[in-house]
């Protein structure tokens, strides 16, 4: 009985992962087609006339995909946003929490540092598609970005490297 239960759990988990490895949605696909391929988005953000569908891979995940849907409900673009290039688009002193959500999606976690007079959002990512890294986006009390600081993601590195 225990083996049957474990087999059922394994098959369910495998079925849940099946969509992750299927073909990505294509530009022009409808919202219904995108959601049939990717499932329910983790968040939905209005962005002017467009809508952003966020597909975050969990708090320990290093990937978040954004599907940009046009006003006609058709896919304009689909991209992985936890990249060096996307972090580089954040404007210090200008971007705020709302704009960061639209650029990067939800953070892996939110922390507070005594040295930062505001919130810090942490994003796990593969820096240069190689290194396990953690990007801190630091906000002031008004929610405006004050700094971006990256370093190794110590939770993902082998203990002997620390």
Give each language-model segment a name.
Residues 18-162:
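Residues within mature, well-folded domains
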Residues 1-4:
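Positively charged n-region of N-terminal signal peptides that target proteins for export
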Residues 13-16:
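C-terminal motif of bacterial Sec signal peptides marking the signal peptidase cleavage site
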Residues 6-9:
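Sec-dependent N-terminal signal peptides
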């Amino acid at each position: 009985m225990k083996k049957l239960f474990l087999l059922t759990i394994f098959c369910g988990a495998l079925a849940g992962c099946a969509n992750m490895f299927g073909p990505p949605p294509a530009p022009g696909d409808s919202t219904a087609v995108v959601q049939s391929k990717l499932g329910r988005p983790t968040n939905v953000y209005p962005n002017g006339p467009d809508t952003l569908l966020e597909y975050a891979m969990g708090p320990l995940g290093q990937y978040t995909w954004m599907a940009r849907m046009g006003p006609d409900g058709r896919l304009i673009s689909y991209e992985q946003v936890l990249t060096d290039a996307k972090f580089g688009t954040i404007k210090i002193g200008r971007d705020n929490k709302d704009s960061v959500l639209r650029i990067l999606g939800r953070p892996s976690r939110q922390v507070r540092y005594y040295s930062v007079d505001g919130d810090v959002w942490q994003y796990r990512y593969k820096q240069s598609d190689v290194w396990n890294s953690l990007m801190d986006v630091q906000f002031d009390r008004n929610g405006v970005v004050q700094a971006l600081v990256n370093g190794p993601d110590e939770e993902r590195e082998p203990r002997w490297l620390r």
